[in-house]
């Protein structure tokens, strides 16, 4: 999502292209905004402050967006990705699908860990563990496993001193040497880790056999089998402690709590709004007088939002997707921030100013962004954002850069790179301009900002009734919101 590695470059080299604006002055410069609904909704769904496994998060998001815009005195135009996947992003969709499947597998492992930890807790509470002379029999084996565990952790945590070179100017100059040294170190380290793992597997099999002969509790035997199949070092540490009789209940409860936090994070990464959620958001926004639409087929939401802005229907785009800068629209990057402090300034990025600060034409800036890598283009191997900037500055455009790189043997340009580059350049420059696409936008101020507070609250009540959501849930998400006309009488307004 967005231009890879662009933000660090902007902050270091083109910080003048970023400005901050206090909320009380925001409407003076940005009375109407195009909002990238997909990105902001996904971010809300995955926030740790959003409850999991409920069916009204999207309702809270729509009402929070509405309250936020009324507080800012700005009118939103909300756009979502078309429900039909964009064929131009087929590779990106495959990558995301692969990542999702990896997260699902990781979640399954963590769920199994939680299951065994809870069983161990019951075992510890019931004191269901045989005591006897077998401790003396397996003492050397436990010591051996503990030593292997320590060695593996040390190898996994060992830092490569070359990784400390992260200065932007030195980063790419040191790449070649660093890669050679890293490969040598990684090869040696991999062999050592594999050798230690083989020893550990052998020792764990001995421990498992001993546990079966000496009638260890089934919970511990099952846990050992799980550890043996996954080689989970964290779980092994706890298992050794309980076998030695030194694991406390508090320590185990703390481990369970940490594992639950890890599980929640994985759940949130898989959490996403359904098409039904989107349609219901449209219904809510219509009630509140906020225009909303899907983007045309083959057009991303941020591109459609940029088209709205460039057709003088909005003053900027609210999103965190830096593709908007490549598309040529100003970007409000921390709009509808998840913190409770409304008074933090909003961050605005101006692509023309950024291009100027980078000493590039805007066309050159677009080429630079595409060379950095986007959802539609990949990077050329060995060329990151720093080197790409130097090349675009020197040659002026991507095509002259590619001609020069073809001469140098150390750069290998993928066979389909130019074709994908041209396709992406067309997507980012040919924005929708058909007036019919913007027909859903009409009389925005009259239908939203010009509503009296009492009228707006009545509409809000209607939404809460329809979706059976309590006002307390909404107020908890918008502690900065106040009803400036009703003030003290606001509580009676919500009685229904």
Curated annotation (Swiss-Prot):
Annotated residues that bind Mg(2+) 2 are located at 321, 323, 375
Query: Does the keyword Nuclease belong to this entry?
Result: yes
- GO cellular component term, pick one: nucleus
User: Sorted alphabetically, which keywords does the UniProt record give?
Assistant: Endonuclease, Hydrolase, Magnesium, Metal-binding, Nuclease
What Gene Ontology biological process does one annotation of this record name? Answer: double-strand break repair via homologous recombination
Which SUPFAM superfamilies does its entry note?
5' to 3' exonuclease, C-terminal subdomain (SSF47807), PIN domain-like (SSF88723)
The UniProt entry, under InterPro entries, shows: 5-3_exonuclease_C_sf (IPR036279), HhH2 (IPR008918), PIN-like_dom_sf (IPR029060), XPG-I_dom (IPR006086), XPG/Rad2 (IPR006084), XPG_DNA_repair_N (IPR006085)
Q: Does the keyword Magnesium apply?
A: yes
Gene3D superfamilies per the UniProt record, alphabetical:
5' to 3' exonuclease, C-terminal subdomain (1.10.150.20), 5'-nuclease (3.40.50.1010)
Q: Which GO terms describe its molecular function?
A: 5'-3' DNA exonuclease activity; 5'-3' exonuclease activity; 5'-flap endonuclease activity; DNA binding; metal ion binding
Note on cofactor: Binds 2 magnesium ions per subunit. They probably participate in the reaction catalyzed by the enzyme. May bind an additional third magnesium ion after substrate binding.
Co-factor(s):
Mg(2+)
Q: Tell me which residues bind Mg(2+) 1.
A: 36, 81, 300, 302
Q: Which family does it belong to?
A: Belongs to the XPG/RAD2 endonuclease family. FEN1 subfamily.
**Protein name per Swiss-Prot or TrEMBL:** Uncharacterized protein C12G12.16c
Question: Native species of this protein?
Answer: Schizosaccharomyces pombe (strain 972 / ATCC 24843)
């Amino acid at each position: 999502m967005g231009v890879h590695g662009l933000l660090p470059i902007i902050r270091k080299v083109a910080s003048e292209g970023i400005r901050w604006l206090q909320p009380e002055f925001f409407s003076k410069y940005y009375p109407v905004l195009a909002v990238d609904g997909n990105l902001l909704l996904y971010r809300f769904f995955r926030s740790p402050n959003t409850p999991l496994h409920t069916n009204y998060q999207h309702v809270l998001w729509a009402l929070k967006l509405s309250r936020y815009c009324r507080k800012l005195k700005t009118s939103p135009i909300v756009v979502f990705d078309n429900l039909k996947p964009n064929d131009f992003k087929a590779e990106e969709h495959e990558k995301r699908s692969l990542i999702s499947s990896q997260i699902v597998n990781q979640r399954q492992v963590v769920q199994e860990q939680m299951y065994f930890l809870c069983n161990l807790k019951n075992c510890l509470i019931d004191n269901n563990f045989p005591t006897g002379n077998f401790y003396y029999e397996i003492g050397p084996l436990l010591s051996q496993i503990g030593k292997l565990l320590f060695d593996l952790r040390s190898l996994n945590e060992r830092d490569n001193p070359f990784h400390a070179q992260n200065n932007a100017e030195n980063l790419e100059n040191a790449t070649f040497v660093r890669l050679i040294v890293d490969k040598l170190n990684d090869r040696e380290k991999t062999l050592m880790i594999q050798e230690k793992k083989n020893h550990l597997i052998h020792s764990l099999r001995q421990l498992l056999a001993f546990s079966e002969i000496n009638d260890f509790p089934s919970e511990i035997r099952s846990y050992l089998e799980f550890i043996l199949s996954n080689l989970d070092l964290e779980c092994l540490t706890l298992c050794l402690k309980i076998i030695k009789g030194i694991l406390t209940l508090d320590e185990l409860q703390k481990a369970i709590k940490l594992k639950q936090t890890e599980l929640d994070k994985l759940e949130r990464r898989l959490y996403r709004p359904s098409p039904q959620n989107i349609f219901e958001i449209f219904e809510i926004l219509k009630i509140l007088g906020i225009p909303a639409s899907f983007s045309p087929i083959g057009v991303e939401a941020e591109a459609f939002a940029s088209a709205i802005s460039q057709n003088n229907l909005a003053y900027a785009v609210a999103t965190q997707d830096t593709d908007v800068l490549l598309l040529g629209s100003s970007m409000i990057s921390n709009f509808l921030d998840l913190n409770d402090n409304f008074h933090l300034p909003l961050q605005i990025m101006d692509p023309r100013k950024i291009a100027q600060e980078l000493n590039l034409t805007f066309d050159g800036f677009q080429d630079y962004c595409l060379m950095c890598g986007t959802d539609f283009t990949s990077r050329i191997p060995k060329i990151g954002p720093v080197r790409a900037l130097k090349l675009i500055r020197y040659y002026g455009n991507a095509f002259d850069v590619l001609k020069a790189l073809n001469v140098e043997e150390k750069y290998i340009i993928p066979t389909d790179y130019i074709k994908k580059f041209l396709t992406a350049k067309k997507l980012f420059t040919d924005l929708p301009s058909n007036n019919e696409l913007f027909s859903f936008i009409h009389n925005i101020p009259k239908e939203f900002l010009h509503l009296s507070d009492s009228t707006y609250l009545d509409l809000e009540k209607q939404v809460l009734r329809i979706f059976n959501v309590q006002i307390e849930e909404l107020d908890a998400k918008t502690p900065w919101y106040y009803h400036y006309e009703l003030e003290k009488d606001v509580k009676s307004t919500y009685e229904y």
